[in-house]
Each structure stands twice: as structure tokens, then as C-alpha cells.
A protein has these predicted regions:
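Adenosine-phosphate binding glycine-rich loop
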Residues: 108-109, 224-370
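Flexible, glycine/charged-enriched surface loops at secondary-structure junctions
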Residues: 2-4, 40-49, 73-76, 113-128, ...
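Structural motif
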Residues: 4, 11, 39, 45-46, ...
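N-terminal ligand-binding/catalytic initiation module
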Residues: 1-91, 95, 102-104, 275, ...
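Glycine-rich phosphate/diphosphate-binding loop of Rossmann-like nucleotide-binding domains
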Residues: 87-200
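Rossmann-like adenosine-cofactor binding region
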Residues: 160-249, 254-255
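Conserved active-site and cofactor/substrate-binding residues in soluble primary-metabolism enzymes
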Residues: 19-30, 53-57, 61, 92, ...
């Protein structure tokens, strides 16, 4: 993804639902303290980001505890990402991974060499999609895909699933889920869960835990395209089975990279101490307004009011973050596509992406003389 933002993985083995908010805060602050003791959290060393079981509150506690331990650190806000806006977060971080998944699918459907391999058209509107997971990633991916015409026919969660062959109303389901904390009682609810991974559909998006597609169910997968929105949802054995079946898999380290891309944007914002758009928003508005005035003068017609507001508006932080994310997802997909089609030895997108990554590391070692 061409981000100077490498890092590591770490976790606390607890169930957040088993602890109240005060207890979670205490646990998080102690965890931050232990990381700091080992020099494992620092704006220039290791910058944690949100993952399963965390939210803006958790990231805010980490940030505040780090600043308490390092009161003179000028870049302290950049020690962690996924923070609330009021604590140095960036607009668009919550939706970032799900939006990145949406952009990945959009890119796939731009390349006829890719989508024609599995009998797809370039249209999103005729695609039937099954999504496993309805957290930040699953919800935002589902919402954007539905907004652009795709049919979300099944959403799978840990307590059951919702099925509607005509397409689920994602926003209505989200409101219900937020209120009830379960799908139970919603139209189309069933207690069946992972069996729906093998449901007849065009696109399958596993957006939850690891290894949900394995050698035991891979042969029954009917989706032609799998987009790995979660980390490691397809085991190595399942991967081989699916490739032999002709299924295309868009790998996790590209498909779900939207989160780390926007975390990088947040980190840069914190280091620069300025929000995105601050230096250009009003200048853009002025220039666009002058352009609209010139068009009205030249044509003798008034620009429609509802269009004028949209055209004249300068780029806000959320506009720039979404634009930057889309560009990074475009760049990433293009590289994978080109590598896959340029080397007959490469049989799948995952291998193509790995070859690109390993070559970058090899080149770095070569030029550094290591």
C-alpha cells in the first residue's frame, strides 16, 4: 500500500462484554503503561490502531494514558489512532476498513480481464452478496454496497443471521441491531449462522474472525468472488481448494487495508497539528464560486441553487480522507492486477500481492547494502 507506517500485532485475551466500562478503562490504561515500559508505544516507534473489541473510547484511554506518562512529548497525540475527533482523531476512520472493502470491489469490477474470468459483468447492481460480520467493517461495507445497488441477501452475526433474497435494508437492520444488540426478532431472522457461508451468491465477504472458511466447507462455497474483509478468514488449505474451483479471492492484506490507510492519515494529521483541508477549503470555494459566476455571465442563465451549493463547496477533511483512501485502494489493486497478469507462474491474487511485498523488502535490503 506504499505506507511508511509499519507495525506489529498485539492483543489482550479478554471478552470486553464481560467487563464494565470502568474496568475496561483500568485494564486499557494498565496495558498502555506496560507497553510504554517496554518502549512498544511511541509516535515514531509503534502506533496502535483499533481492531476487534475496541472502539474510540479505548483508543482515547490509550492516548490519555500515554500523554500522562509523557507530559512533555509534543507529538503525544500521534501515539495511537482511531481516537475520537475531539481527541485528535480523523473524520472517516470508523468507516475506513468497510469503505476500503467497497473500493476494492469497485476496482475489481473495472478490470474486464478479472471479472470476466468468473462470468461477472462490470455492474454492481446485479450482484448478490453474503456478509459475515456486522461490526464496523461489515456494516459499512454492506451499507455502501447496498447504496450502490448491490443486493445484500444475507448478513451473518454470532447470534444468528438475517436473510432476504430481495435485499436487506441495511440501515433499518443497523438501527434494530443497535437497539436490541441482536438480530433476533427481525424479519428474516434465523439462528443458522455459518452454514450461510456456503449460500448461493455472487460475492462472499467474511468480515469477522479468522479461519471461517476451511477445508471442511471450502468445497461447498458457491460464491465466485471472496473479499477478505476480516483478517485471515480463509485457511491455507481452503485457499488451495477455492483456487482449484476457480474462485477469485481478494486477499485480506489488501482488501481490509482501508483501516491502516486512514490510521496513517490520522497519524500524519497529529504530527502536522492541522486538520486536512484547513489550508485549501476556502480557497477552493472562492475559485469555484468565481467559475460559477463566470458561467452565469457567459450564458446569461442562473446556476441552479442546489447545484451551486455542491459545486462551490471546498474539500472538507472527510472529502480528502475518502479521496485519499480511494486512491490508495486503486493503486494497490492495479499493482496486484498487473503482477498477476504479467507472470504465468502466479496463479492467484494473494500470491501476486505477496510477490509485490517481498520484492519491496528485497529491493530495500539491496539498496541499503544489508
Amino acid at each position: 500500500m506504499e505506507l511508511p507506517f509499519g507495525g506489529s500485532k498485539g492483543a489482550l485475551i479478554i471478552d470486553p462484554n464481560a467487563w464494565n466500562k470502568k474496568e475496561l478503562e483500568k485494564i486499557t490504561r494498565r496495558f498502555t503503561s506496560e507497553l510504554a515500559k517496554r518502549n512498544l508505544i511511541h509516535p515514531s516507534q509503534n502506533v496502535p490502531a483499533p481492531d476487534m473489541g475496541t472502539d474510540e473510547n479505548v483508543m482515547a484511554w490509550i492516548s490519555d494514558e500515554y500523554r500522562r506518562l509523557n507530559p512533555t512529548e509534543i507529538d503525544a497525540l500521534a501515539c495511537v489512532t482511531g481516537k475520537p475527533i475531539s481527541m485528535g482523531g480523523v473524520y472517516g476512520r470508523i468507516e475506513a476498513t468497510g469503505r476500503g472493502v467497497f473500493y476494492a470491489i469497485k476496482e475489481f469490477l473495472k478490470y474486464s480481464k478479472d471479472y470476466k474470468r468468473i462470468g461477472f459483468t462490470c455492474e454492481l447492481s446485479d450482484k448478490r452478496i453474503v456478509i459475515q460480520g456486522f461490526g464496523n467493517v461489515g456494516y459499512h461495507a454492506a451499507s455502501l454496497l447496498a447504496e450502490h445497488g448491490a443486493k445484500i441477501i444475507t448478513v451473518i452475526e454470532k447470534n444468528g443471521s438475517v436473510v432476504d433474497e430481495n435485499g436487506i435494508d441495511i440501515e433499518k437492520l443497523k438501527k434494530y441491531f443497535n437497539r436490541k444488540k441482536t438480530f433476533e426478532g427481525y424479519d428474516g431472522f434465523t439462528k443458522t449462522r455459518n452454514r450461510f457461508l456456503t449460500k448461493d451468491c455472487d460475492i462472499l465477504i467474511p468480515a469477522a474472525t479468522e479461519s471461517v472458511i476451511h477445508k471442511g466447507n471450502a468445497k461447498n462455497i458457491k460464491a465466485k468472488l471472496i473479499v477478505e474483509a476480516g483478517n485471515g478468514p480463509v485457511t491455507a488449505e481452503a485457499d488451495r481448494i477455492l483456487i482449484r474451483k476457480g474462485v477469485i479471492i481478494i486477499p485480506d492484506f489488501y482488501a481490509n487495508a482501508g483501516g491502516v490507510v486512514v490510521s496513517y492519515f490520522e497519524w500524519v494529521k497529529n504530527l502536522s497539528k492541522m486538520r486536512y483541508g484547513l489550508m485549501q477549503e476556502r480557497e477552493e470555494e472562492k475559485k469555484q464560486s468565481q467559475l460559477v459566476d463566470a458561467l452565469e455571465l457567459m450564458t446569461g442563465n442562473n446556476f441552479p441553487k442546489h447545484l451551486r451549493t455542491e459545486v462551490v463547496k471546498g474539500s472538507t477533511e472527510i472529502d480528502l480522507v475518502r479521496s485519499g483512501l480511494e486512491e490508495k485502494m486503486r493503486e494497490g489493486y492495479k499493482k496486484i492486477h498487473e503482477k498477476y497478469h504479467s507472470d504465468k507462474k502466479i496463479k492467484d491474487f494473494r500470491t501476486a500481492a505477496m510477490v509485490i511485498a517481498v520484492k519491496k523488502i528485497a529491493d530495500a535490503y539491496k539498496y541499503l547494502g544489508i
